[in-house]
């Protein structure tokens, strides 16, 4: 993993909310809580309005990675329109650096991004995120669903823990730690049982454990 100057374009939430979240993430990762990150906080504005400002920030701060939260705030038209999808992808490509754009899924189908197929056609790497809540923690699964010029890595799982102040810890996890993640990924019951058993010590599990 290479560290690089990063810009996060926040179109969804208040700047104060993101400063609080950054403090919590830094603390959970064992970093200096005051560690800075460059943001453009523009809740209520659109990617179309901020294009020039983003490009200027990329040049001024030698940014190498840009995050956009999210494409639903692009302000370039209906997301189901092919021309809108192409315009958004073109705008991001014009930044001349690596970019990550957060997309949302339709209510009826969590396997792809809401909108035109050209969103997925225009991405080099597509990552699907799934989650499962449990008392005091949140299980996260990340799966690379598209990879143009790299080998697809294995699925990654993380456990986020929380206290009264918010996020307090981040650690790696196993898919068997969060059974509902297996349901989302593998609806076939037989395959889920197989994965669960193989994830146990000595690859053994009782009937009650499986149930």
What are these language model-derived features?
Residues 6, 99, 205:
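Hydrophobic anchor at the start of a short beta-strand
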Residues 72-76, 104-107, 198:
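A broad detector of the eukaryotic-type serine/threonine protein kinase catalytic domain
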Residues 59-62, 133-211:
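C-terminal regions of RecA-like/P-loop NTPase motor modules
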Residues 65, 82-169:
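Phosphate-binding/switch region of NTP-binding enzymes
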Residues 79, 96, 201-204:
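Residues at alpha-helix boundaries and short interhelical turns
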Residues 2-83, 87, 174-179, 187, ...:
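Conserved inter-motif catalytic segment of the P-loop NTP-binding fold
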């Amino acid at each position: 993993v290479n560290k690089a100057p990063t810009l996060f374009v926040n179109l969804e939430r208040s700047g104060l909310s993101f400063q609080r979240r950054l403090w919590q993430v830094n603390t959970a990762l064992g970093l200096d809580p005051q560690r800075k990150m460059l943001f453009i906080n523009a809740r209520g504005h659109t990617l179309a309005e901020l294009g020039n400002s983003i490009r200027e920030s990329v040049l001024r701060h030698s940014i190498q990675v840009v995050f956009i939260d999210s494409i639903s705030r692009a302000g370039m038209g209906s997301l189901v329109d092919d021309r809108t999808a192409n315009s958004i992808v073109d705008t991001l490509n014009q930044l001349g650096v690596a970019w990550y754009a957060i997309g949302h899924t339709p209510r009826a189908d969590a396997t792809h991004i809401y909108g035109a197929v050209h969103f997925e056609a225009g991405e080099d790497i597509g990552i699907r995120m799934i989650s499962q809540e449990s008392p005091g923690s949140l299980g996260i699964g990340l799966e690379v669903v598209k990879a143009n010029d790299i080998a697809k890595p294995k699925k990654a799982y993380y456990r986020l823990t929380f206290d009264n102040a918010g996020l307090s810890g981040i650690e790696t996890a196993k898919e068997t730690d969060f059974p509902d993640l297996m349901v989302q990924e593998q609806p076939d019951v037989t395959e889920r049982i197989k994965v669960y058993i193989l994830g146990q010590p000595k690859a053994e599990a009782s009937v009650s454990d499986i149930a």
